Regions:
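Flexible, glycine- and charge-enriched loops at secondary-structure boundaries
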Residues: 76, 103, 162
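Loop-centered beta-sheet repeat module
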Residues: 134-179
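Extended glycan-interaction surfaces of carbohydrate-active proteins
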Residues: 1-25, 48-83, 107, 112-133, ...
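N-terminal beta1-alpha1-beta2 module of alpha/beta enzyme domains
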Residues: 11, 20, 24-32, 36, ...
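Residues that mark the junctions of alpha-helical repeat units in TPR/alpha-solenoid scaffolds
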Residues: 27, 31, 79, 83-86, ...
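Well-ordered alpha-helical scaffold segments within catalytic/enzyme domains
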Residues: 32-46, 85-102, 143-160, 193-204, ...
Length: 249
């Protein structure tokens, strides 16, 4: 774990941004995943520098661009899943540190981000991925559902109530569970496990879903295939399935 965290820290830019690889592009979701990894490894100062980057780069509407390169915007559209994920990272850092002063600073950032995402929620309850309202993703919306639960926990820690967020999460979950036709059909493993990881599918239904997709996506002795019809086993999907199994118990 230390070697992985040291690799992340080595890739981190002086402004706090964490690209995919040294000199590569940055997206807010992977940036946040990396920041959480830094916290787990005890590199709290580096993690806070990553959150400072988010504070400085949040746009007036509460969103971030989908991709950055060389310190500037490379793809300006908002990815709703990427923007919502700041709630997950913020809750994680607060649980690790207990730093209320830091949370007071981050709360307005989270509040604006969730507002930006929920402006894309449709009457069906689903949330569009980017600019095209017709594209809605199972994994992305499941991740947003997770982010909403964490945003609500942060609101509670702040002594605030956001009933509209509860309603948004309820409607989003109902769409994911009851209206599969709304979402793009994809062959990716993440569409199999993310509804469980995002607490959309729970209990016996989660166990059944894992069992139904296991042979389709899991390569024994190796890990998880990124897509069911190709032989590649990927570290990211394997790690996420491990988290899903841990969350399921």
């Amino acid at each position: 774990m230390k070697a992985t965290a040291d690799g992340i820290a080595a890739a981190q830019r002086p402004d706090g941004g964490i690209p995919w690889e040294p000199g590569g592009h940055l997206d807010p979701w992977n940036h946040l995943e990396a920041a959480m990894g830094l916290d787990v490894a005890g590199l709290g100062a580096e993690a806070e520098a990553a959150y400072d980057w988010l504070v400085r780069n949040q746009r007036p509407d509460g969103s971030w661009a989908a991709r950055y390169r060389d310190g500037g915007i490379d793809l300006s559209t908002m990815d709703t899943n990427f923007t919502a994920y700041v709630a997950v990272g913020t809750r994680h850092h607060f649980l690790v540190t207990g730093d209320r002063t830091w949370l007071d600073r981050m709360w307005p950032v989270v509040d604006r981000a969730i507002g930006a995402v929920l402006r894309r929620q449709q009457p069906s309850g689903a949330i569009s991925w980017r600019d095209d309202p017709g594209i809605r993703l199972v994994a992305g919306c499941s991740s947003i559902h997770h982010a909403l639960t964490q945003a609500l926990a942060l609101a509670s820690a702040m002594g605030l109530h956001r009933p509209q967020w509860w309603d948004a999460a309820r409607r989003l979950r109902a769409a994911l569970l009851g209206e599969p036709r709304l979402f793009a059909a994809k062959p990716h493993a993440m569409d199999w496990y993310y509804p469980i990881l995002g607490s959309v599918v729970t209990g016996a239904d989660a166990t059944a879903r894992l069992a139904a997709g296991w042979d389709r996506f899991v390569e024994p002795g190796l890990g998880v295939r990124c897509v069911h019809h190709e032989p590649w086993v990927t570290g990211g999907e394997t790690a996420e399935l491990a988290l899903t199994l841990a969350a399921r118990g």
